[in-house]
Amino acid sequence: VTLLKSKIGSVRCRIERLLVIMSKQDSVGRHTPRDTSAVGLNPIKRDVMGAAMRVLTRITGSELADRYKIRETIDRITYQSTKTGFKTLGAATRTFKKMSGGASGPQRLTTAKNADFFDLTPTDDQQMITETVREFAAEILRPAAHDADEAAAAPADLLARAAELGITMVNVPEAFDGAADERGVVTNVLVAEALAHGDMGLALPILAPSGVAVALTQWGTEDQQKTYLPAFAGDDVPQASVVIAEPRALFDPFALQTKAVRSPSGYRLNGVKSFVPAAGSAELFVVAAELDGKPSLFLVEAKSKGVVIEADPGMGLRAAGLGRLLLEDVAVPESARLGDDDADVRAEQYADAVRLSRLGWAALAMGTGQAVLDYVVPYVNEREAFGEPISHRQAVAFMVANIKIELDGLRLATLRGASRAEQGLSFAREAALARKLATDKGMQFGLDGVQLLGGHGYTKEHPVERWYRDLRAIGVAEGVVLV
């Protein structure tokens, strides 16, 4: 009850602050609202009113308003702000169009200010976001995970329901109707962990568009950002992925077999990509390909000629609806290439993309590992053998303790890497450590969970066997989850 009252007070304080901001906005006058039209045809205004109304719309459309008894306050604020319009994005047949006007030059998020001390305590905003996402994962993802795993596909409305959380919007600059004013790598890691606690397979299609938004924000040109980023700040977020992995043994992301060659009109891409979540409904890909002997990233729309998508379910992550992306002489314009004009700089930017994705996969291992721990502790305390709980046996107790020890080590390494990346510091070492820990210890989390449940761990009546299969993917996965 105390925690609930605290949450209600926190939400009400935020609503009241929004009301004050709106009042100040009214005092200086508002711009004439833009007309609604097709995606990207109108300039995006950077006014506080628009940002506040987007937040209120998300809260009003969810259960939070009734749960925390703030609907009356929201209605009062909304009534005062009826002149603010909202733009609805297209459906699966969308055409990405460049927005006119707006800020000049590509928009980059600033690095976070370096604190004088190492603090693992989340900020108030991070805590609120994490709690909201964790609740979504528990109420929506966990119950749907079993059926999604059996069907090898995520629910059709999953991304739309997740869009209410604003997971993608927090990586889009304010200039494009987003909510970001600086890099939020740590926040993205916390969000990925919270979603994976519900189910890692279902977390992938939700996080994949956010990875594309990160790539566009970090390395996209002004034209690329104006064409694609506005779509990632709305309620109809396109299914999109950063695809790096290729279907071959001992895959090295820095030795790509997908090739890009120059053509009179731009580039032509050939190759095969794997680990593409929700591949059948994807609209946009950021494809890693080798250009002139060095890796680069290219924007490829799903409707491009020569793009073929095949289902490719695996042992784990079946709920993600994994597929393969076949690129057969796909022509893209020169403007489709992400990153700097200098090949060496572009290669380093690609390396950062790989490192960010490895931090993302480590975060998924953290969330799933925590799910294993939370599941086995009550089980070993309640399961009795020879007249006492099996947790009284040292072999069992030590195994549970080791999960917690290794999980905390993985979490520390991942958060340290995320913190350094957020501050614009080198994080190559930390990303490598997080990758190694996630690969080795993550798989051990799943294995120990199955062992602790005994025969039950091998059956689908318990989710631990699914988590074990999902965790085995950490060592071979690349891309997708850029934080």
Regions found by a protein language model. Give the residues of each.
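A short, Trp-centered hydrophobic/proline-enriched beta-strand micro-motif
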Residues: D235-A245
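Short, contiguous pre-domain boundary segments
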Residues: P106-P122
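Glycine-rich phosphate/cofactor-binding loops in nucleotide/flavin-utilizing enzymes
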Residues: K24-R108, V191, G211, L453-V483
